Structure formats: C-alpha cells, structure tokens
Amino acid sequence: MEQTYEYAWIIPFIPLPVPMLIGAGLFLFPTATKSFRRMWAFQSVLLLSIVMVFSIYLSIQQINSSSFYQYVWSWIINNDFSLDFGYLIDPLTSIMSILITTVGIMVLIYSDNYMAHDQGYLRFFAYMSFFSTSMLGLVTSSNLIQIYIFWELVGLCSYLLIGFWFTRPVAANACQKAFVTNRVGDFGLLLGILGFYWITGSFEFRDLFEIFNNLIYNNEVDFLFVTLCAVLLFAGAVAKSAQFPLHVWLPDAMEGPTPISALIHAATMVAAGIFLVARLLPLFRVIPYIMYLISVIGIITVLLGATLALAQKDIKRGLAYSTMSQLGYMMLALGMGSYRSALFHLITHAYSKALLFLGSGSIIHSMETIVGYSPAKSQNMGLMGGLRKHVPISKITFLLGTLSLCGIPPLACFWSKDEILNDSWLYSPIFAIIAWATAGLTAFYMFRIYLLTFEGHLNAHFQNYGGKQKTPFYSISLWGKNGVKKNSCLLTMNNNESTYFFAKTKYPIDKNGRKMTRPFMTIAHFEHKAVYSYPYESDNTMLFPIFVLGLFTLFVGSIGIPFNQEGGNLDILSKWLAPSINLLHQKSNNSMDWNEFLKDAVLSVSIAYFGIFIASFLYKPIYSSLKNFELINSFVKKGPKRILWDKIINGIYDWSYNRAYIDAFYTRFLVGGIRGLAEFTHFFDRRVIDGMTNGVGVISFIVGEGIKYIGGGRISSYLFLYLAYVSIFLLVYYLLFSTL
C-alpha cells in the first residue's frame, strides 16, 4: 500500500500534457492540430479518468486503513531556511480528488458536443485540463506555499474560462471582476500565510498545527495578532467561495460557457475556499473568535444567496445564487465545528449542482434554435415554459437536481443538509431559525426555476413583441418589474419590451450543426402569423453525463447513512473521515439517534414542501386558469391591505433584482472613492508637485530676463555691482557677528 502512496505525487501532473501539447500544436502546426481536435478531447477524458481510478483506489485504501501519508522534498537554501515541497494524502485529499475527477470527466464529455461548433474548442479543452491540474495540485499540497501557488493557478484558470468569449464586452468585464475581487482575498491569504510562518516558523500543515497548538496551550502568542492572521487566511476562502461580502463576482461568472459554470460551481473554484477552511480547521478551532466569524459569514451568505435568487430571470444566475447559499451552509457547518457535515454537503451538492448546470445547458442549447444565439435571450426564463414536452430527459434529470437541492428524501442533499440543520440547533437557535427558513426559500426559488422553465406553454411563441397589447394566453408571472410594478395580477404576464425575435430578425442555424428535422407550425396570434420551431432534446453525448450525474444525485447520499448499526454504528463517510475527525475531536460520537433524526427530517421536509407549494401556487399554470375564481380575485382586489402587500412585494423584488444593492454600494463608494482618490492624486501631482518644480524654472527665467534688461553690456558696471554686493554682504555679516 505504501508503494501506491509513493506514486501519488503524479496525480496533479497526469492531465498536464494535454494543455501543453495543445498549446505547442497550435503554435507549431495549427492546421493539423485543429483537424484532430476530437483526439485532444478524448485524451483529456482519458487522462482524467486515470486520475479518477487512482483516486478511488487510494480512497479505498484509506477507508480500510484509516491512515495519512505525507512525503516532503526539502530544498535547503541556507542553514536557517529551506523550502519544502511535497504531497499529503488524507481523507480530505481523496474526497476532493474524486469530486474533481468525476465531475470533470462528465463536464468534458458534455463539452465535446456543447462546444462542437465553437472556434475556441481546443482552447477550451486546454483551459479545462489545466484547471483540473491546478485544482488537483491544490488538494494534494502539503504546505501553505504550495497551496498559494496552486490557489493562484486556479484563479488564473477561472479568469480565462469566465472570459472565454472575451470578444463580448460583458464576458470581458465579468472575468475582470472575478479576478479583481479574488485579488482582495488572495492578498489577505498571502499576508495570513506569512503571519503564521512568522509565528510558527513552518509552512507544513502537520508541523504548523502542532507548534501552534503548543504555543496556544502555553499562552506564548499574541492573540490579537493571531486573530488578525487567521482573519486574513479566511479572507482568501471568503473570496474564492463567494461568501459575503466578496460574493459579487459569482453571478457575473455565468458569462462563460455553461460547462464552465458546472465545473466552477460543483468541484473546482468555489469548492477551493471550503477546502481551505476544512484543511486549516485544526488551526482555526483553537481561536474561538474565528470559528464564530466563520459561522456568522456562513449564515449571512445562506440567507443572502437565497433572497437574491428569488427574482432572477436568467436561469444560470438563479443557479449561481443557489450555489452561493449552499456554500454558506458548508461554511456555517465548518464554523460550528461540524467537519463531517460540511464535507458531506460538499459532496452531495457538487453532483446535484453539476446536474442542474448541465441540464440548464441542455435547455439553453435547445432554446437557441428559437431565440437565437444570445445569452440574454436563450437563458431568459421569461421566454421558456412548456419544455417538458420537448426535452423530457432534461426535464426529469433537472427535476431530480431540483428536488435534491430542496432537501427531499431520498435524494443526496437531503441527508447532508439535514445534518447541518440539526447541528445548527445545538450551536445557536438564531442561526438555526435562519438556516431552516432558508431551506424553505431554497425550495421556493428552485421550484420557481423549474416551473418557469418546464411548465405551461413556450413563452417565446406568445410574446407580444410590439409591446402594445397584453398577452393573457400564458399567465405565469416571472415576478418582474413589468408585472409587479403596475400592480397587475401576479399571475398575468405583461410584455412591454420592444424585443423582436421573429418579426424583424432572422437567426440562421449553422448548416454544419445537428442535421435534425424539426416540426414547424404557423401560429395565428393577435392577427399576425409567424413560423416557429420547437426546442429539441440534446444529443446523447450531452445526455449521458446528465444521466450519470442523475444517478449520483440519487445514490451518493447513501455514503452518509449508517446501514449497519453493529459495533460502532459507522457509515462509509464517517469511516472514510475517521483520521481527520479524530484529529479534530478526540472523543467523537458517531452514533445516530433515529428517532431524533426522523423528527428533524419530518420538520425539514415539511418546510421544503411548504416552499414548493407556494412556488406551485404562484407559478404553476393550472392556477393561471383560475383567474376568475373568488380565491384569485381576492388577491387582485384593491384596498389598503392590497396596496401594502404590493409595496412589500415590490420591496422584496427590488432587493433581489438589484442584488441587495451591494454592487451599487461598491460601485459608488469603493470604486467611486478609489477614482476620486486617483483624480485627487493626479491633480496634486500635476498642480502641486509639478507646479513647484515648474515654478522654480519660471521664476529663474523671469529673474534672468529682468537682470538681462538691467545690465547695459559694460564690464565695468558689472564689476562695480559685484563689489557693491560683496561689500554689503560683508558689512551685514560684520554687524551681525560683532554684536554676539
């Protein structure tokens, strides 16, 4: 077994040849490299599959032996300082390696079809393979220096992938926003690393934890400085995992291709922050203020992400805010010390969210044949609806991911989220109330996304593009400004946007694309006729990864269920994490009280079903046909209560649609303040600093010109003036010093 561990250092480097060979091929033999581009995709999948098999084998060995393995190479610079490079294989490493490889393989297979007609196909696969290399290097690092190096490489890859379509100004701005926001956290991470090295004299995790715990036990450290260093370390995780207040880059990151969104939100970039906090938890747990800060940031992010998802019209942005909220649950669990629950939710959420993003990509792909190749249109849920008849496989798998994220048993996220909710009662009742309420919000906004996308009729066929008439045919409201601001019935859609899809603009479909015959029909609507096509199901290359992730969503939660209660009541996950849990808690109780579990499960599932019911009441098409019934009319009647209710709804909508005004606050005060400071600095430099320098020159020029006109050109006059000035100077000097 030890021989197997000795070769674990190769894990990050196995996918690396693909980006290197693609880059060299495009530089030296561009035509030949592009002609064999499918071969590069196959190699990317093959190499990552090798890493996956190796990671699974290491995980099985760890489950059976419950051991760590660390290997270090030392580069001695002098007698007082040396750089150590190595790798650490422990339960956290093996979990993250399996997540990265399994999700990464599914995304690569999916991308082969999704990016088939993109000119940047090879560049995309080069970035993806390098992204996997960077993340695998991060999770296998044995010290903080390696962590920081691969941390920056992960940030670089995310910058390249978010701005993959860099010719679009929106995508270029999004990748810059992500890069700059993460620079704030990365700078804090670097300062924190240097601070703890100054305290302990080591970058290695095992030595760092041992030395620091001894210093704390003997009260030999400055707690204020230690707390500051810990906060700086945590700032890196806050930025990378999109936690409040450095979350603003996450929704804009949706400007990249959809497979990138799946990888970033499931197993790579946003998971890196959770991984860092989990890795450094032995360091943080002896600093109570930091643990409380982690839990506070987590619970704020949980609620904020859920509220911001309520009014999103873009399907990918809605899922992005959902990711933000679920990451908040993980951070809350880590802050409470629930190490196992946090990693369990990291696993279950990764597969569920990858399923949802790839499913949304399939939906977007199908909508592009109708509304054109524009993200603002193909991702707009207001133009969707009724897709269950056209994309049934995507509908079923998307529903699985939605139910899992809502916490409906027996799907994956039910088991992990329920543990976090139960632990929150023991930690803080206030945090528990917020966490449980947010579980209901999660069910509401996730089913809102599902219903707007799949239920009812296809909205793109019934849009009133002229904006002169109301369109009551299809009455699911998107809860947008057009519906809410005018105090119209919540279940009626008004279209006042002057957007033309079929009347004025034609969107040709690539002839080299899918050669599929689709039914066309002519729909007469408000005295105008147009020819419409319907969405279609994606190809098998895209459906296969979605199907596999659906299976993961169904069954991955079983690793945390204690089936065998004899002799310790350990489930697979607890046995897997036993070395890490024992390191954190010497006397860990892994037993499960099934009665308590059932009570809490009934409550959490009831809250989830309540959120689903509210979403169904507001967005399911069956209620749109009840517009004349007394129940619906009671909501529409005007009156003081109705006006107050409209104000509340408008306020919630504005809060959610405007991203809680946090972006506006940063733009006005932070960006505006920096620009104001820059303008003041520019003014001071040009007017004051340069003014003093230029002023001396101007004065010298004026004095010189004045003297030039005084002089008459006679040397005798110059000598007379010179002697006169010297005589006056000597006289003054004599008078001053003779009196002393």
Curated annotation (Swiss-Prot):
Membrane topology: Multi-pass membrane protein
Superkingdom to which the source organism belongs: Eukaryota
Localisation: Plastid, Chloroplast thylakoid membrane
Class of the enzyme per the UniProt entry, highest EC level: translocase
UniProt keyword Plastid present: yes
InterPro entries in the cross-refs: NADH_UbQ_OxRdtase_chlpt_su5_C, NADHpl_OxRdtase_5_subgr, ND/Mrp_TM, NU5C-like, Proton_antipo_N
Subcellular location, principal: plastid
Alphabetic keyword roster: Chloroplast, Membrane, NAD, NADP, Plastid, Plastoquinone, Quinone, Thylakoid, Translocase, Transmembrane, Transmembrane helix, Transport
Catalytic activity: a plastoquinone + NADH + (n+1) H(+)(in) = a plastoquinol + NAD(+) + n H(+)(out); a plastoquinone + NADPH + (n+1) H(+)(in) = a plastoquinol + NADP(+) + n H(+)(out)
Single Gene Ontology BP annotation: electron transport coupled proton transport
GO molecular function terms noted in the UniProt entry: NADH dehydrogenase (ubiquinone) activity; quinone binding
One cellular component (GO) term of this entry: chloroplast thylakoid membrane
Transmembrane segments: 9-29, 40-60, 89-109, 125-145, 147-167, 185-205, 219-239, 258-278, 286-306, 327-347, 354-374, 396-416, 425-445, 543-563, 602-622, 717-737
Any Pfam family the entry gives: Proton_antipo_C
EC id: 7.1.1.-
Self-association and partners: NDH is composed of at least 16 different subunits, 5 of which are encoded in the nucleus.
Its biological purpose: NDH shuttles electrons from NAD(P)H:plastoquinone, via FMN and iron-sulfur (Fe-S) centers, to quinones in the photosynthetic chain and possibly in a chloroplast respiratory chain. The immediate electron acceptor for the enzyme in this species is believed to be plastoquinone. Couples the redox reaction to proton translocation, and thus conserves the redox energy in a proton gradient.
Family: Belongs to the complex I subunit 5 family.
Name of the protein: NAD(P)H-quinone oxidoreductase subunit 5, chloroplastic
Organism listed in the record: Nicotiana sylvestris (Wood tobacco)
